[in-house]
């Protein structure tokens, strides 16, 4: 039986490699959301974003040139 969804059965590191340079949304365990351009991600899920924005309770809180997020704080990464 074939997978109907292209994301099923994919290696997460391959997906992350494909979206380098793309706009992403990163949600933290605390509920804070960052949106920006993915510059790098490592094996520990540490993330570097460029032109990033921080959203708290759905409202823009701050804009950053660069943001570095420690991997153990990441709930998920979503390509926009």
From Swiss-Prot:
GO biological process, alphabetically ordered: maturation of SSU-rRNA; mRNA splicing, via spliceosome; tRNA processing
Gene Ontology molecular function: any one: RNA binding
InterPro entries: Lsm6/sSmF, LSM_dom_sf, Sm, Sm_dom_euk/arc
Disulfide pattern: none
Major subcellular location class: cytoplasm
Compartmental location: Cytoplasm; Nucleus
GO CC terms of this entry: nucleolus; P-body; sno(s)RNA-containing ribonucleoprotein complex; spliceosomal complex; U4/U6 x U5 tri-snRNP complex; U6 snRNP
Domain of life, per lineage: Eukaryota
This protein's UniProt keywords: Cytoplasm, mRNA processing, mRNA splicing, Nucleus, Ribonucleoprotein, RNA-binding, rRNA processing, Spliceosome, tRNA processing
UniProt keyword annotation of Transmembrane helix present: no
Residue ranges constituting the Sm domain according to the UniProt record: 11-80
Physiological role: Component of LSm protein complexes, which are involved in RNA processing and may function in a chaperone-like manner, facilitating the efficient association of RNA processing factors with their substrates. Component of the cytoplasmic LSM1-LSM7 complex, which is thought to be involved in mRNA degradation by activating the decapping step in the 5'-to-3' mRNA decay pathway. Component of the nuclear LSM2-LSM8 complex, which is involved in splicing of nuclear mRNAs.
Subunit structure comment from the entry: Component of the heptameric LSM1-LSM7 complex, which consists of lsm1, lsm2, lsm3, lsm4, lsm5, lsm6 and lsm7. Component of the heptameric LSM2-LSM8 complex, which consists of lsm2, lsm3, lsm4, lsm5, lsm6, lsm7 and lsm8. The LSm subunits form a seven-membered ring structure with a doughnut shape.
The family this protein is said to belong to: Belongs to the snRNP Sm proteins family. SmF/LSm6 subfamily.
Record protein name field: U6 snRNA-associated Sm-like protein LSm6
Biological source species: Aspergillus fumigatus (strain ATCC MYA-4609 / CBS 101355 / FGSC A1100 / Af293) (Neosartorya fumigata)
Native organism taxonomy: Eukaryota, Fungi, Dikarya, Ascomycota, Pezizomycotina
């Amino acid at each position: 039986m074939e997978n109907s969804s292209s994301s099923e059965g994919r290696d997460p590191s391959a997906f992350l490699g494909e979206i380098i340079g793309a706009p992403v949304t990163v949600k933290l365990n605390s509920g804070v959301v960052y949106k920006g351009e993915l510059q790098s991600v490592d094996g520990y899920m540490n993330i570097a974003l460029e032109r990033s924005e921080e959203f708290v309770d759905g409202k823009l809180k701050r804009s950053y040139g660069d943001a570095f997020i420690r991997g153990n704080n990441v709930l998920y990464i979503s390509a926009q």
